[in-house]
Amino acid sequence: MSETEAEASVIGIIELFHKYTGRDDMIDKPGLLKMLQDNFPNFLAACDKKGTDYLANVFEKKDKNRDKKIDFSEFLSLLGDIATDYHKQSHGAPACSEGDQ
């Protein structure tokens, strides 16, 4: 049986996470910032245009357990914020309307 579009999307998210993780299956701060710059340049540019430095403190906000690493659930929380912003854009909101989360 072939993958559905939703299944392929979830697998793609897992692959994206693994592309930037270390041996411990976690992403450090430089890795997270690189992942955002590599994969969400339009989102970051929109935030910069609004004067919001999204990269300045996103790591600290998402590292809920303060272990200086981003685990998969913290990564999903970050992607959820970005996806929510894109969803709001689909309803006419400006880009990076929630970029300072």
Swiss-Prot record:
InterPro entries listed in its UniProt record: EF-hand-dom_pair (IPR011992), EF_Hand_1_Ca_BS (IPR018247), EF_hand_dom (IPR002048), S-100_dom (IPR034325), S100/CaBP7/8-like_CS (IPR001751), S100_Ca-bd_sub (IPR013787)
Keyword Zinc annotated: yes
PROSITE patterns: EF_HAND_1 (PS00018), EF_HAND_2 (PS50222), S100_CABP (PS00303)
Gene Ontology cellular-component annotations: cytoplasm; extracellular region
Coiled-coil blocks: none
Keyword check for ATP-binding: no
Subcellular location: Cytoplasm; Secreted
Pfam family, one: S_100
A single BP term in Gene Ontology: endothelial cell migration
Alphabetically ordered keywords of this record: Acetylation, Calcium, Cytoplasm, Metal-binding, Repeat, Secreted, Zinc
Residue numbers binding Zn(2+): 18, 25, 87, 91
SUPFAM superfamilies: EF-hand
Ranges where the EF-hand domain occurs: 8-42, 50-85
Family annotation (SMART domains): S_100
GO molecular function: calcium ion binding; calcium-dependent protein binding; transition metal ion binding
Major place of residence: cytoplasm
Quaternary structure (record): Interacts with RANBP9.
Protein name stated in the entry: Protein S100-A7
Organism name: Equus caballus (Horse)
